[in-house]
Amino acid sequence: DLIANPEVKDTFVKRSQILKEIRAYLDEKGFLEVDTPILTPFEIGASARPFYTHHNTLNMDMVLRIETELYLKRLIVGGMDRVYEVGRIFRNEGMDPKHNPEFTTIELYQAFTDFHGMMDLVEELYKRLAQKICGSMVIPYQGKQIDMGHWERLTMIEAVKKYSGVDFNDWATDEDAIAAAKAHNVELPEVPTKGAILAEFFDAFVEDKLIQPTFIYDYPVEISPLAKRKPDDPAFTERFEYFIDCTEYG
């Protein structure tokens, strides 16, 4: 396949170049690259199903990690202000074009900033990658022109209103949110609170519209139990995710 299809080889080359540039960028910003354990004695972090193995010398069952988050956070607590890891993750779950049991993540943590500062860092990194790897801020991809030079920033409330016409602020009670969900054929979550229903509206009306780079922030606390709550509105959190071509990238 590599011999017959040059574009396949080009994918490998670009992946290597991207990782090199990410490391260079983060190193310039004062981040320290670290390696955290891949084999762990118990399941930690995300709710994904892990792969199990057995350590013969210690005679104990172990798991392959399903995330790098908790060990990196320990390093931050221990006094390392900026850390990142390029690491393999293993999840014993289904496969589709967006999911693989073994994949690479790039996870980073920085003390003494806020989520707006982290959004700035992510945007700057992607712009650098586009220019250095592709030679342009506009990248053709599957018939679309992705403009890495412009990133929209919307709260989840703003995004839902923009793409569905439904205004979260019109819901005074959970019952109002339930009625709105039924009127728009939106699936009700197991615990149908206003915030949880807002997230269902996002999934139903917004995510598949986010073709150009977009930050979504101010997530409801119901779906963000570990995120810092907003001081002025504890029903929402200082959390963001970003989407490109209808896909969440971080």
Label each PLM-derived region with a short phrase.
Residues 37-128, 146, 150-250:
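A translation/RNA-centric and nucleic-acid-associated enzymatic feature enriched
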Residues 29-36, 81-85, 134-135:
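Short secondary-structure capping/junction motifs at helix and strand boundaries
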Residues 35-39, 134-145:
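Short, glycine/acidic-rich hinge or "gate" loops at secondary-structure transitions
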